[in-house]
């Protein structure tokens, strides 16, 4: 559920 958060940190 953190795909959006991970994508931003990537």
Curated annotation (Swiss-Prot):
It comes from Phaseolus vulgaris (Kidney bean). The keyword Transcription does not apply. GO terms for biological process: defense response to fungus; killing of cells of another organism. The keyword Transmembrane helix does not apply. This is Antifungal lectin PVAP. GO terms for molecular function: carbohydrate binding. Belongs to the leguminous lectin family. Antifungal, antiproliferative and hemagglutinating activity is abolished by incubation at 100 degrees Celsius for 15 minutes. Antifungal activity is abolished by incubation with trypsin at 37 degrees Celsius for 30 minutes. Keywords: Antimicrobial, Fungicide, Hemagglutinin, Lectin, Plant defense. Has strong antifungal activity against M.arachidicola with an IC(50) value of 9.8 uM but lacks antifungal activity against F.oxysporum and B.cinera. Has hemagglutinating activity towards rabbit erythrocytes. Has antiproliferative activity towards L1210 tumor cell line with an IC(50) of 3.6 uM. Lacks mitogenic towards murine splenocytes and does not inhibit HIV-1 reverse transcriptase.
């Amino acid at each position: 559920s953190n795909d959006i958060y991970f994508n931003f940190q990537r």
